[in-house]
Amino acid sequence: MGQTEPPEVVVVNDGSTDHTDTVIGEAAEVMPLVRLDHKASLGRSGAANAGASRASGDILIFLDGDTLAGPHFVSSHLEMHRKGPGLVGRGETHQLRCTRFFADPETGSPRPGEEERVAAMSAAELSRMRVTLHDVVERFQSVHDRSQPGIYPGAGPRRLFELEMEALRAYPDCSVLWAAASGSNQSVSRKAFLACGGFDEAITINEHRELALRLCKAGARMAPVDGAFSYHLTHRTGWRDPVADTAWEEIFYAAHPIPAVPLMSIFWASLSDPLPFPAVSRITSLPELEAAAERCRGVVGIEKVRQAHFKATASEIAAK
């Protein structure tokens, strides 16, 4: 909605039990869309694969259901893909912290447990924090002006965003750029997506990075999509942290037994405070992740790789 280059929109209602059905129905009245409804949830990866199978365009762009697309979102992704074949696009992911108290940012209705906080807002504060359809269609700059870089609030997510985009722009030959993939703002040719088998449906978190790694192994190259802004409507509950929720890691590593996979969690944790490990073992950029993975080449096993990294970094400091 409000795109400078009209897209084909495929919406997957993956077994939702809330008012999602109504929201999709209302959207279908004002814009053309292809709708898929699942009685039972297939999970994030399964839902994305189902949507991709129904898409007819040459380029697939993935966007989460709680995320807005800026006016140049589609046109920027398409322009990037016109630069050459074999590209996987990563757009600029922002978040809207102002929506964190609302079940519906349009009306300002509170999330469960936030009733008192929302009731205490002045009319002016409520107006500043709501994100309405009118804002999206007629005055999107006001939405952008209220956003911050990163998918979630906080210094860590913002720094991660900055490091990922910096690596994509400044280190195009870095071998671990697949780790900069974004599930809520990522594009790939439909042909390449289908050829590699789509998302691994056994992985329900971090699936976008696993897909990006497979695509890169097949010869694709990660690239930044400047100007393709997405805006995550921040919510305090209902999201999963890949550092704390590590169910993805064993499946990911079984498919790709390379050191960079278990070292990703050290990279992410290095951006937090306090550190859960000695400061000398921090990994603070994707080129550093690449170097750390190279040092651990030949080490097999998730925990063995991490312990090898800790030992190697401690030894380097001791040698100095």
Language-model-detected regions and their locations in the chain:
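Active-site donor/metal-binding and catalytic loop motifs
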Residues: 217-242, 252
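Short, acidic, metal-binding catalytic loop of nucleotide-sugar glycosyltransferases
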Residues: 1-6
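Conserved donor NDP-sugar-binding/catalytic core segment of glycosyltransferases
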Residues: 72-154
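Catalytic core of nucleotide-sugar-dependent glycosyltransferases
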Residues: 227, 240-266
